[in-house]
Amino acid sequence: MNLNATILGQAIAFVLFVLFCMKYVWPPLMAAIEKRQKEIADGLASAERAHKDLDLAKASATDQLKKAKAEAQVIIEQANKRRSQILDEAKAEAEQERTKIVAQAQAEIEAERKRAREELRKQVAILAVAGAEKIIERSVDEAANSDIVDKLVAEL
């Protein structure tokens, strides 16, 4: 093998080129690659955190929705109970009012009936006395007539 100056010059030039690249070209390339790797790793970590946060937010929203539905159901049940209670109270009050009005009306009817009966008795007594006077055409005795009228009124 023949070593000549050209091969030796090329070898020295290649070694110098490699040293130059290792000194000035390689570090910025490695720094750029490491920076890009770090950005990608940070992006992936951020995406993972965002995904976990999203899952937590979904779970929290689901829990809050369940709680809100439960509270709404409780409120609806309370409103229904209150509505039933108000209706029952109104029915009871209406029944009491109806009973009171019926009793008052019956009392008024009874009083009117008694008054009408008494008025009728008085008119019958007057008609009986008038009829008796016309039949007899004269009064026998005022005391006897009043006894007869009282007996007649008592019989009615």
Swiss-Prot record:
SUPFAM superfamilies linked to this entry: F1F0 ATP synthase subunit B, membrane domain (SSF81573)
Residue pairs linked by disulfide bridges in the UniProt entry: none
PANTHER family: ATP SYNTHASE SUBUNIT B, ATP SYNTHASE SUBUNIT B', CHLOROPLASTIC
Site (Required for proton pore formation, as well as F(1) to F(0) binding): 131
Keyword line: ATP synthesis, Cell inner membrane, Cell membrane, CF(0), Hydrogen ion transport, Ion transport, Membrane, Transmembrane, Transmembrane helix, Transport
Main location: membrane
Site (Mutation prevents the formation of a functional proton pore, but has a small effect on the binding of F(1) to F(0)): 9
Protein name, entry field: ATP synthase subunit b
Any one GO molecular function term: proton-transporting ATPase activity, rotational mechanism
Transmembrane segments: 11-31
InterPro entries found in the cross-reference section: ATP_synth_B-like_membr_sf, ATP_synth_b/b'su_bac/chlpt, ATP_synth_F0_bsu_bac, ATP_synthase_B_chain
